[in-house]
Amino acid sequence: VKYAPRVSDPKRAGGALLDITIYPITYAYRLWGYPVKIESSGTIENGIDYGEDVMLTFENGLTARISASIVDMKGLEKMTISGEKGKIQASFYHATNQVTYKKNIFHKEVFKGPGPRINSYLDEFDAVAEDIRAGRLESKMVPLQATSDVMHILDRVRKQIGLEYTELE
């Protein structure tokens, strides 16, 4: 299987963790905060992580089960939050404009927002530009602590699965 260099080159910290697993981990963090327990396993070959299974347990008792793979994306293009009153599903975590609520097999509601931009990074760029124009040194939307916390979670996952970024260490 041939991948883009940003994904397949260990010198660029390529692999699933920093390319796709970061999105559901960030989403779980933004919903429930920093987890009290992080458990993970992964598949590593030639210095590249091809996928991870991560379980984050939060103080409120909720658990996020995350699976991500750069080899087999079938079925992984969505994020699902399940609870006692049903489940919420959204297409890929980063640029979705639609959320589906399923109470049971008979009840389904679809909520649509404005269409995703062609490149959802434009939203992030616009937010940063606004912060700079306003003289803010930190984003209200994604404070430095949130970025640091997510990176710490990713680092814990990396260590648990035995992934090394030799060029960065």
Predicted feature residues:
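Predominantly a Rossmann-like dinucleotide-binding segment in NAD(P)-dependent oxidoreductases
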Residues: 1-39
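A general structural signal for well-ordered alpha-helical segments in protein cores
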Residues: 24-28, 51, 96-98, 121-129, ...
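Short, solvent-exposed loop/turn elements at beta->coil junctions and helix N-caps
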Residues: 40-46, 69
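Active-site beta-strand termini and strand-to-loop segments that position acidic
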Residues: 54-61, 81-83
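C-terminal helix-rich "cap/oligomerization" subdomain common to oxidoreductases
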Residues: 59, 127-169
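Glycine-rich phosphate/pyrophosphate-binding beta-alpha loops
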Residues: 67-74
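Short polybasic amphipathic segments
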Residues: 79-81, 96-105
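Active-site loop of classical SDR/Rossmann-like NAD(P)-dependent oxidoreductases
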Residues: 112-126, 142
